[in-house]
Swiss-Prot record:
Protein name: 3-isopropylmalate dehydrogenase
Gene for this chain: leuB
Superkingdom of the source species: Bacteria
Family: Belongs to the isocitrate and isopropylmalate dehydrogenases family. LeuB type 1 subfamily.
Residues flagged as site, Important for catalysis: 143, 192
Residues binding substrate, per UniProt: 97, 107, 136, 224
Keyword Methyltransferase set for record: no
Provenance organism: Clostridium pasteurianum
Any GO MF annotation of the entry: 3-isopropylmalate dehydrogenase activity
Gene Ontology biological-process annotations: L-leucine biosynthetic process
Amino acid sequence: MKEFKIAVIPGDGIGPDIVREAVKIMTKVGEKYDTKFNFVEVKAGGDAIDAYGEPLPKETIDVCKSSAAVLLGAVGGPKWDNLEGSKRPERALLGLRGALGLYANLRPAKVYNVLKSASPLKNEIIDEGVDLLVVRELIGGIYFGDRGTKEVNGVETAFDTEKYNVDEVKRIAHSAFKAAMKRRKKVTSVDKANVLDASRLWRKTVNEVSKEYPEVELSHLYVDNTAMQLVRKPSQFDVILTNNIFGDILSDEASMITGSIGMLASSSIREDSFGMYEPIHGSAPDIAGLDIANPLAQILSAAMLMEYSLDMSEAARDVEAAVEKVLNEGYRTADIYIEGTKKVGTSEMGNLVLERL
């Protein structure tokens, strides 16, 4: 029997409600695949502020570091809005990424056939299929480069610096190509190499890394063209590889194409496959504890965890298939409900997925 320690951070708002369902699903998967998951619950975000006076206690970092992966619910809420920046719940996410060395953000965007009416795009575009993954470099680039504000010739002037070295590009490129090997074996690297030196280094390095993955088809697009192509023909994309700032923008654009944010998972990973997995939606404190939140993004985050951190691809496919089956049978939580479908609560949705595993 395989055994894995999983750090669990329920967090704030609906976090505990949806994490509960994901843990339930993983436990069932463990029974099916002769695997034992040892879940260790720790605090971060507002939950940790209330308990310890800080958003990211040392105990949480230590437990995460000694685990195979981290399953996170959601952090934040208006209750803590008046705290200074460094003490706010959201600082826990930045702190965890830094402490755990998570440099690659993986954001899938998939339109389920039965939910395509939620997409803002025309049916003829969606009908071609949308199932892509944005791989974004997370801890380099312009967000972390030299910056400042100063007077130049008597005029207030601000600057930020886009900077990458070869090693930083190599490691994120490897993450993208490895992800593509699990998917349709196609990588689109996105840059602005017609203007930026940093992008020219990016493109040159990605080309070098691609030689190690002869099965994967590589293409390059400028970021402005990519933004256009995402709404014109999203079916052309499998894995999109890009830097921090471009990925920040493109991953949000891709998520909006689906029209159902409650369905979208994400992960932040590093070279050894360790990662932190969470839904992209917020903590929605107004519906916390009411059994109406959609747990599917959290359940799909657990599927990503099993695929990318535990090398349990078959189990991940099982979970994804169970989710799709429940949707095809017409079950919906309030956020994706339309007339003619069957509305269910958080716990019942989790049970429905469980039954179909």
